[in-house]
């Protein structure tokens, strides 16, 4: 069964405390969403993960995650982001969201997607990359994610982060770990509620991925945390992770869980949209 552990941390020291041995030991992949932290500052964190385990990093316009300090799911957006398109702009902040996948059932790569056997792909790509054409050729399951400022993978032998165009974390077809996805531009609770209503019997939500356009959040609502709060109201106690995007990758509509629709018809690159994916786990 896939286990997802995630947290929004205020600084590198808090991130290191979260990435303790009992969290990263035996993990399958670690993903870091960073706002306001250069890659070099995160090398000590990446070194805590076993050399054979992929560690990916996204340099973000903003981040979404569960903050122990705030006791809730929150969002942070870089100062002024969105004013270039007429928005009020983000009000600043720094943070790091760590997402650690363990227990088997996921594969991660930068060059290829599984030719078969996957039920969903999380995709993070550098804005301006050719990720859309790549997905059109290789995706065999629906995808969710978005475009960041930059994407990196950690190179253990060289102790550095290497810039890459994109990375993927694919969930494999394991019965205990269904994944569902939808997209919305309005009615957050309605969209997420519809997806929840399709969750397989005997399952519970384990984590929620949230990938909104950076023209949403404060630029859409005038205040922060509207969408994280709406998700939390429906799924109390469930952690959220993700980032604000400059182009959102995901379904055109609600796909339910473990959809078998061809992603070339069911998914696309969006704008001014929020993508939601719910990871479910067996309730037993």
For each predicted feature, which ranges?
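Hydrophobic alpha/beta core scaffold segments
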Residues: 1-284
């Amino acid at each position: 069964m896939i286990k997802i552990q995630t947290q929004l941390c205020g600084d590198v020291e808090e991130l290191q405390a979260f990435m303790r041995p009992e969290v990263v030991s035996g993990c399958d992949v670690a993903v870091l969403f960073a706002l306001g932290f250069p890659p070099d500052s995160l090398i000590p964190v990446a070194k805590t993960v076993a050399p054979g385990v992929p560690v990916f990093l996204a340099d973000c316009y903003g981040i979404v995650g569960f903050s122990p300090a705030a006791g809730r799911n929150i969002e942070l957006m870089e100062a002024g982001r969105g004013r270039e398109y007429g928005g009020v702009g983000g009000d600043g902040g720094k943070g790091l969201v760590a997402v650690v996948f363990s227990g088997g059932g996921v594969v991660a790569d930068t060059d290829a997607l599984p030719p078969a056997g996957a039920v969903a792909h999380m995709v993070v790509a550098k804005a301006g990359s050719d990720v859309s054409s790549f997905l059109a050729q290789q995706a065999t399951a629906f995808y969710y994610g978005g475009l960041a400022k930059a994407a990196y993978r950690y190179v253990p032998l060289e102790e550095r982060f290497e810039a890459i165009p994109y990375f993927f974390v694919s969930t494999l077809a394991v019965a205990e770990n269904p994944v569902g996805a939808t997209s919305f531009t309005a009615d957050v609770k309605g969209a997420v509620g519809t997806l929840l209503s399709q969750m397989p019997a005997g399952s519970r939500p384990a984590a929620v991925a949230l990938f909104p356009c950076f023209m949403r959040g404060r630029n859409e609502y005038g205040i922060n945390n509207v969408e994280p709060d709406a998700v939390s109201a429906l799924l109390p106690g469930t952690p959220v992770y993700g980032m604000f995007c400059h182009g959102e990758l995901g379904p055109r509509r609600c796909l339910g869980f473990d959809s078998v629709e061809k992603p070339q018809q069911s998914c696309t690159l969006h704008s001014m949209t929020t993508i939601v994916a719910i990871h479910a786990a067996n309730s037993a």
